[in-house]
Amino acid sequence: MYKIEQKDFGYYLTFSGFIKKEEMEEWYKESLALLEKAPAHFGVFADLRDMKPLPAESQSVMEEGQKNYKQKGMVRSVVVLNSAIPTMQFKRIAKTTGIYQWERYIDASSNKDWEATGIAWIKDEIDPDAK
C-alpha cells in the first residue's frame, strides 16, 4: 500500500506491506502527475516503517521515481525505516539515482522523534546525521 500527501514542505509518502511491481508502477504514474504541478523546490518525507523489502522489479520502478522527484525540484528527502534490509535497499537506490547526498535515513526504532527529526531536515537543513 502507498499514499502520497501534499504538505507545506512538499510530499509525504507512506509505503507499507509488500509492494509488487504493479503497485509501484501506480505510485510512479501518480507521482508523475503530481510532479507536473510541483513547486520549483520541495522536500520529500518517506515513511517506510511498515514496508517489507522490495522485490528487484519494484526497486527499478522506485529508482525511476526517485530520479523524477529529483529532476522536478526535490532538494532534500528523508526516509524513516524500522528494518535493516529496506534501509540497505534505499541507501543503494539513492546512490544509484544520485540523490544520496540530499537524503537522510532515520531509524524509528531508536529515534522516538523520527517525524520531527525528518521534517527539521527537510524544512531547516538540520542534519540528523550531525552529532
Describe these PLM feature segments.
Residues M1-K131:
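Amphipathic, Lys/Arg-enriched alpha-helical "gate/interface" segment within cytosolic domains
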